[in-house]
């Protein structure tokens, strides 16, 4: 299992202040940036389909069979995941990365809840609806792990379209037998027993968005040993995990993210990813909301590595081998540096 790429080392770094930056004031060159694209050669081989496209017909099927197959399989999944190991709330870049990391252990059952029909969050595009995805080094090592190509620059890499990352990690993740994505499903609330988060309250997303117009639409539940909240920054449906913790008195305040500072923000997001209350780990831009870290803008490395760290923290909380406390056994990539979680730097919310 690969360790986590980040800008911090677990064993050899001195403690940093809350929002220390890794940027050292290097001058920005006025010269045009070389795109540096390498020429690629493609070979196209003609293949013959195993059917006649001019006289194609499908095998017959009864409409009721289609209905039964969809219903039976979905209901089986709902029964199976009514009590699970980990629930990841939010399938953006951080949530998908967390689920990917956790599910490397085939014995851990992972449910992903995403209120949108289309998972991926903001990772289908770069900034301002542009296509390219910018990832600062050394987070590109995660792209190497999942097999996403990029154009390499000195301190960062560029994926030609953000959708390449999202579609790749999603296809790898959903192919794993211990993962189930429940999209178009909203997490309306948390299950809390004593002082520990023990799962989420769920409903169809369209129902959750229309409680003001309809009545008698009670929810469902999904119990979990660990909840990973990756609900993004504040907005109509953002940062819902930490906002709910505040409203029920489990944390004191949610100051909200500060103005944009990429060099400070990305290090802080990874460093401050943690289990904020027993049973609930916060990752991605939701970390900025609870800690008042700066927003990072259209760079995605911290989302990936924060998600990886959250995944390893979840494994640790489950008492399983993980990269946080060094109990991971296997073929670790020596060039990957673990994102340290210095308890002295944990901020009281």
From Swiss-Prot:
E.C. number: 2.4.2.60
Induction or repression: Up-regulated by osmotic stress, sugar deprivation, high salinity, and hypoxia. Up-regulated by abscisic acid treatment and drought stress. No effect of thiamine, salicylic acid or paraquat treatments. Down-regulated by dark incubation.
Superkingdom field: Eukaryota
Required cofactor(s): Fe cation
Described function: Involved in biosynthesis of the thiamine precursor thiazole. Catalyzes the conversion of NAD and glycine to adenosine diphosphate 5-(2-hydroxyethyl)-4-methylthiazole-2-carboxylic acid (ADT), an adenylated thiazole intermediate. The reaction includes an iron-dependent sulfide transfer from a conserved cysteine residue of the protein to a thiazole intermediate. The enzyme can only undergo a single turnover, which suggests it is a suicide enzyme. May have additional roles in adaptation to various stress conditions and in DNA damage tolerance.
One Pfam family, short name: Thi4
UniProt gene name: THI1
Keyword Signal carried by entry: no
Coiled-coil ranges per UniProt: none
Record keywords, A-Z: Cell membrane, Chloroplast, Iron, Membrane, Metal-binding, Mitochondrion, NAD, Plastid, Thiamine biosynthesis, Transferase, Transit peptide
Quaternary structure note: Homooctamer. Interacts with RBCX1 and RBCX1. Interacts with CPK33.
UniProt-listed GO biological process terms: DNA damage response; oxazole or thiazole biosynthetic process; response to cold; thiamine biosynthetic process; thiazole biosynthetic process
Name this protein carries in UniProt: Thiamine thiazole synthase, chloroplastic
GO cellular component, one term: plastid
Modified-residue entries (2,3-didehydroalanine (Cys)), positions: 216
Main location: plastid
Record NCBIfam families: sulfide-dependent adenosine diphosphate thiazole synthase (TIGR00292)
Transit peptide (first-last residue): 1-45
Reaction catalysis annotation: [ADP-thiazole synthase]-L-cysteine + glycine + NAD(+) = [ADP-thiazole synthase]-dehydroalanine + ADP-5-ethyl-4-methylthiazole-2-carboxylate + nicotinamide + 3 H2O + 2 H(+)
Protein family per UniProt: Belongs to the THI4 family.
Localisation: Plastid, Chloroplast; Mitochondrion; Cell membrane
Result for mutant: residue 211 to F: Disrupts thiamine biosynthesis and DNA damage tolerance activity
Record note on modification: During the catalytic reaction, a sulfide is transferred from Cys-216 to a reaction intermediate, generating a dehydroalanine residue. Not phosphorylated in vitro by CPK33.
